């Protein structure tokens, strides 16, 4: 049986936490003397009331969550956070349409960064701060935050972590996962704070620095400017953000190794080497192409290509140039990068590099099997044999990922959306990327899409952020059977 009471209680606790975030954003509104503080107070009152009710209704539940409970909790938590998180946008009239308000909030909490706003600079500071905060909270995971504080309430967070996490196959979940989660949040917060300081040194004011730091470490890509990072026209800011986007694309368990000075173990990691090599490879190709086919000089070609490759590789979605003005062959390369993603166990979306490593090794072994039919060729990563069941899961995930992309592109096309735009929107959403192709590229918003398309893309953002199986399991009859 699903532990309904405990799940309800945890959702209530999360809503109370979301209320405190609303109050923080209202403080920003008051600081700037803008009227959006009322929207946060109203949203906070509604959210707190529902949260307290759920906490009361959830008393007396079994505090030990099963794995099945974890899957339900993760999906429901994300949807609940989005439904209540959209209230400041909707109540304040800043996004008066429910579909658009839900889309914008889901885009934030899934760290996608696709926006329907056509006038970002016209929004009040509190609303922009909340918009930026959604991707920072969603980046590492509402549930990662949950399991760090669940032990305080006597609830085990282990099964929640197993459901939400996209840790790589060779990583083991620590038995005291709450401690691990707190360490990861400490690193996450420290990286964010350091980036704020560096951006301020580059000329950004404190507000824009915090918002862009949230967007960078959360790999969300929401900017406070319609032109994104290109607005600042600053090589310093572009290089700094590039470095921190790359860092945020690294598995956080590897960053903990760095903090603990276990450099050899960190830099020998197969996934990290693949990630770094991929960034170097694509940056080189695109930089050389831009140098010979555009008016850019050598440094600018390198900087623009490095920034865009890392931005799309980490599913951040910031832009310093409209890549739709680049040669069409580069659109294909950028689309491949969108699908690949960065490291598992990071704030990024996409297939993840660890799956690419496994697919590469499986393909290589199959070629060898043709030459040596009787050879036993296990897949090894970091000198450890990957279990056949894990390989099967990776293959199934990739097949399902591609199938959903193809089916969604066909659905989008059936709605009258251009084929290039359909491809860009679908891949961008399921990979939690942000900008797409064509009329949904980095220079445009997604406001012109029909409502049905926005609901479909919101669903793709959710399943992409939660690694497909977490959500899709809920639609299988077997999941709900008692045994």
Question: What residue ranges belong to the model's regions?
Answer:
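Membrane-proximal intracellular helices of multi-pass ion channels
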Residues: 1-483
């Amino acid at each position: 049986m699903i532990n309904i009471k405990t799940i309800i209680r945890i959702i209530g606790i999360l809503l109370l936490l979301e209320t405190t975030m609303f109050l923080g954003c209202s403080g920003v509104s008051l600081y700037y003397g803008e009227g959006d503080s009322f929207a946060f107070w109203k949203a906070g009152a509604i959210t707190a009331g529902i949260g307290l009710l759920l906490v009361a209704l959830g008393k007396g539940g079994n505090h030990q969550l099963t794995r099945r409970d974890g899957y339900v909790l993760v999906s429901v938590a994300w949807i609940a956070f989005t439904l209540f998180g959209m209230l400041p946008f909707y109540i304040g009239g800043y996004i008066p349409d429910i579909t658009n308000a839900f889309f914008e909030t889901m885009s934030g909490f899934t760290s996608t960064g696709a926006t329907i706003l056509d006038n970002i600079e016209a929004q009040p500071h509190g609303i922009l701060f909340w918009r930026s905060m959604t991707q920072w909270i969603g980046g590492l995971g509402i549930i990662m935050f949950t399991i760090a504080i669940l032990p305080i309430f006597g609830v085990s967070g282990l099964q929640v972590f197993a459901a939400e996490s996209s840790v790589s196959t060779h990583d083991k979940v620590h038995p005291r996962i709450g401690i691990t989660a707190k360490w990861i949040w400490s690193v996450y917060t420290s990286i964010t704070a350091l980036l704020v300081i560096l951006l301020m040194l580059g000329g950004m004011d404190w507000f824009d620095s915090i918002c862009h730091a949230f967007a960078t470490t959360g790999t969300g890509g929401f900017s406070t400017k319609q032109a994104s990072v290109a607005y600042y026209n600053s090589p310093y800011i572009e290089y700094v953000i590039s470095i921190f986007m790359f860092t945020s694309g690294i598995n956080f368990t590897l960053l903990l190794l760095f903090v603990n000075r276990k450099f050899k173990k960190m830099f020998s990691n197969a996934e990290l080497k693949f990630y770094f090599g991929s960034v170097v490879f694509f940056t080189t190709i695109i930089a050389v192409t831009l140098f010979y086919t555009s008016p850019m000089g050598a440094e600018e070609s390198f900087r623009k290509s490095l920034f865009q490759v890392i931005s799309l590789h980490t599913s951040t979605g910031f832009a310093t140039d409209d890549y739709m003005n680049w040669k069409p062959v580069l659109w294909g390369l950028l689309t491949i990068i969108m699908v690949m993603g960065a490291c598992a166990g990071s704030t990024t979306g996409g297939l993840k590099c660890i799956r690419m490593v496994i697919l590469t090794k499986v393909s290589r072994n199959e070629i060898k099997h043709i030459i040596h039919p009787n050879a036993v060729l296990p897949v090894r990563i970091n000198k450890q044999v990957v279990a056949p069941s894990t390989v099967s899961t990776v293959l199934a995930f990739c097949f399902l990922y591609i199938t959903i992309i193809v089916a969604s592109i066909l659905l989008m096309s059936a709605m009258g959306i251009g084929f290039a735009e359909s491809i860009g929107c679908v891949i961008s959403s399921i990979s939690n990327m942000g900008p797409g192709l064509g009329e949904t590229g980095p220079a445009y918003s997604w406001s012109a899409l029909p409502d049905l398309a926005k609901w479909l893309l919101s669903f793709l953002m959710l399943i992409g952020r939660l690694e497909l199986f977490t959500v899709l399991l809920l639609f299988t009859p077997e999941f709900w059977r008692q045994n």
